[in-house]
Amino acid sequence: MSDGGKSSSSYFHFFAGLNSGILSAVLLQPADLLKTRVQQSRSSTLFGTIQSIASGPNPVRQFWRGTLPSTLRTGFGSAIYFSSLNALRHRASLGAAGRADAAAKGAEHSSSLPKLSNTANLATGAFARTWAGFIMMPITVLKVRYESNLYAYNSLFTASRDIFRTEGLKGFFAGFGATAVRDAPYAGLYVLFYEQSKRKLSSLATKIEQTSGASTKLSTSTSAGINFVSGVAAAGLGTTITNPFDAIKTRIQLMPERYGNMVQATKKMYMEEGLRCFFDGLGIRIARKAVSSALAWTLYEELIRRAETLKEVVEDKI
């Protein structure tokens, strides 16, 4: 098995991340839109929001409102994130003591990506996500505004022009503080939980296959299943811990003049609505994050595995 970071080109990771991000964004846009609508007002409920959209004109189109900015944000955001994460993880693995021994011990594993310590997984995941989030923040602001029913934007150009005219360039980075505080811990915790879960499930699956007399090498379907289950579990834990920051971020991006910055928003939300408002949209976010993260990571790892396999075949023929 490859170490992933060494044999696969950074282009593989960029395009694998791009494809996995686009697919998950398109499939799960309705959940993202519902989360935004529920978080924008204390009076909104999930059922009421679904009923309101479904009874309105063009319900199917309305559920996928904002798909273009979501696809741009998630697609290119995932591409930047995965390629940055791979570069950081590969660099960290080169400097880790006992790397060769660690790789040998982890030979029967559902992933071909570099194996790092828990601290390194936490740090690289957090840094890569913050960097990708900063680059994609203008698209994120456009996405949230476009999904909300507080604004009557007819196009992304109209939304961009209005934000720039009323708020200036800083308007495109509204909520970045809350986003970074949410995304950095989430991404770090996700990579940490994801890698731990994969390691344990891979070890368990290998023992089961050895007991049954099958090959000790995990099959493609088994590896994909392990990666998907690990992604769901990691997303659920990370999402629950970081949801308050997501709720704060959404309020700032939708109503910057009312909520100002992260500290002001936190105080105002708590004083006016209590602790519960920080967990608005948690159920939708867990469901969406669990599926989107698991889908994106499983597809990403499978594309990388296939790219490496193809590369090895080509190199063997040369």
Curated annotation (Swiss-Prot):
GO term, biological process aspect, one: heme biosynthetic process
InterPro entries with a match to the protein in the record: Hem25/SLC25A38, Mitochondrial_sb/sol_carrier, Mt_carrier_dom_sf
Solcar repeat windows: 8-91, 116-200, 222-306
Disulfide-bond pairs as recorded: none
PANTHER family listed in its UniProt record: MITOCHONDRIAL GLYCINE TRANSPORTER
Family membership noted in the UniProt record: Belongs to the mitochondrial carrier (TC 2.A.29) family. SLC25A38 subfamily.
Keyword Ribosomal protein (UniProt): no
Membrane topology: Multi-pass membrane protein
One Gene Ontology term of the molecular function aspect: glycine transmembrane transporter activity
Name of the featured protein: Mitochondrial glycine transporter
One cellular-component annotation, GO: mitochondrial inner membrane
Pfam families associated with the record: Mito_carr (PF00153)
Record field: transmembrane: 14-39, 66-92, 122-147, 175-198, 226-252, 281-299
